[in-house]
Amino acid sequence: MTLWRIRATVDDRPGFLSVLTASLALRKVNILSVQVHTTETGAVDDFLVEAPEHLTRADLVDAVQRGRGRDPWVSPADVRGLVDEPTRVLALAAKVLDGTATLEEAIAALLGDCDISWRAGATTKSSAVAAAGFTATGMQLPDPAGGTLYVRRPAPAFTPAEYARAQALVEVAKVGARHTAS
């Protein structure tokens, strides 16, 4: 068996997720975990699955599309994906606070395969608010140390939940910086 991460948008209506999961089950794909990210265009379902060795990325994309999933993204995964998401995020926050990880390292671990760059800028509250925001492929986050962090990822598209998690890590880093300065 092979581990895969699958992300797809499904209409947020009764029964639509079950159609997708049935399509995967027909191919002997076992769903190990699922996260649901609510968006304006539907529910973005993020699965960690175990699939028979012979199934390819294309086979899984086909299964998702036949199950009424849209915008499928499929990538190989490993056992680290089995860690409970809230536990993983709390561990990242602890690393930021105790200094064993930088904010950039924690955000990269949180969001997966992404590029993070930093640009100098003012650090007033209004500039920090102006620096915040996200699109499908990018995020802007105020760096508590000053400037702005730019996060880019071509796929899968960022969700509001991922943006909120990244913002929460920024807030944790702010608290850590205040305590360090004290």
Task: Tell me the role of every PLM-derived stretch.
Residues 1, 120-134:
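Positively charged, low-complexity terminal tracts
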Residues 1-95:
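A conserved regulatory-domain signal marking ACT and ACT-like small-molecule sensing domains
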Residues 12, 16, 56, 99-103, ...:
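Short amphipathic alpha-helical segments
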Residues 27-30, 96-124:
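Helix-loop-beta substructure at the N-terminus of cytosolic sensory domains
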Residues 119, 151-152:
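Conserved beta-strand segments of the P-loop GTPase G domain that flank and frequently precede/overlap
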Residues 133-147:
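Short hydrophobic beta-strand micro-motif common in sensory/regulatory domains
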Residues 152-164:
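Regulatory loop-to-helix N-cap segments in sensory/regulatory domains
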Residues 165, 169-182:
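Signal-transmission/dimerization alpha-helices at domain junctions
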